[in-house]
C-alpha cells in the first residue's frame, strides 16, 4: 500500500496520465484468487499489471512458471481379512499402487518440462485387512495448457487402470490451477533497474 501511495504521488509530480490501482488477491496461492478476479472483470481495463510477492530471501524478477492441474482420487474396494480370506476382498490400496506405477512408467512418454507428483491422503494406515478405501492426491504441471490437457488424458487412463486391474471402483476429480506465466521482460527490466537504483539487492536472472 505504501508503494501504491508513493506511485500516485509520483504520477502527480511528473504529470503522468492514467489510473493506478493496488489490487489485493485473497487465497491466491491455494485456490486461484487471481483467476476469480480475472473472471470478475477486475483486469478488463488494465494495460499493464505487475505482481509483487513478498519473500524472506533476496529479491528477484520472476520468469516463466508452469501451469498445473490437481486431482483428488478415491478408490473403493471390498474389505476382507488379509490372512484368513484375502481372496474375498478387492484391495483399494493395490489399485492406488497400480495407478502410481502406471503414472511412473507413463512419464517416459511425456514432453520435457512435465512434472507429476502424488501421495496418499487416507487408507494407508492399517494392516491386517484388505483395504476397501484409499484416497490420493495427484498434481501435474507443464509449460503450456495444451501439454497439461494431453498429459491429463494419460493420467486419467492410469487412474482408471488401477481400478480395472483390481476390480475396484474409482471416483476422481481434476481441477485446473493457474495457467503458465508469460513474463513481460521490458517491465521486469525496469523493475530491476529501479530496485538497484534504490539499493535493493537483486538475484541474477
Descriptions of predicted regions:
Residues 1, 7-131, 141:
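Histidine/acidic-residue-rich, glycine-tolerant segments that coordinate divalent metal ions
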Residues 2, 13, 51-72, 162, ...:
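Short N-terminal signal/transit or membrane-insertion segments
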Amino acid at each position: 500500500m505504501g508503494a501504491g501511495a508513493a506511485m500516485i504521488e509520483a504520477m502527480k509530480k511528473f504529470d503522468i496520465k492514467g489510473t493506478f490501482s493496488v489490487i489485493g488477491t485473497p487465497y491466491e496461492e491455494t485456490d486461484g484468487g487471481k483467476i476469480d478476479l480475472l473472471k470478475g472483470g477486475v483486469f478488463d481495463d488494465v494495460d499493464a499489471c505487475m505482481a509483487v510477492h513478498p519473500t524472506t530471501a533476496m529479491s528477484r524478477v520472476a520468469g516463466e512458471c508452469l501451469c498445473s492441474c490437481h486431482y483428488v482420487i478415491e478408490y473403493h474396494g471390498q474389505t476382507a481379512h488379509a490372512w484368513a480370506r484375502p481372496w474375498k476382498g478387492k484391495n483399494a490400496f493395490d489399485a492406488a499402487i497400480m495407478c502410481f506405477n502406471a503414472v511412473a512408467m507413463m512419464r517416459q512418454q511425456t514432453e520435457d518440462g512435465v512434472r507429476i507428483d502424488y501421495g496418499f491422503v487416507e487408507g494407508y494406515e492399517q494392516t491386517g485387512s484388505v483395504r476397501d478405501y484409499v484416497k490420493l492426491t495427484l498434481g501435474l504441471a507443464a509449460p503450456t495448457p495444451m501439454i497439461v490437457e494431453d498429459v491429463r488424458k494419460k493420467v486419467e487412463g492410469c487412474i482408471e487402470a488401477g481400478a480395472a486391474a483390481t476390480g475396484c471402483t474409482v471416483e476422481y476429480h481434476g481441477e485446473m490451477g493457474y495457467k503458465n506465466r508469460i513474463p513481460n521482460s521490458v517491465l521486469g527490466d525496469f523493475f530491476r533497474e529501479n530496485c538497484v537504483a534504490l539499493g535493493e539487492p537483486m538475484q541474477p536472472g
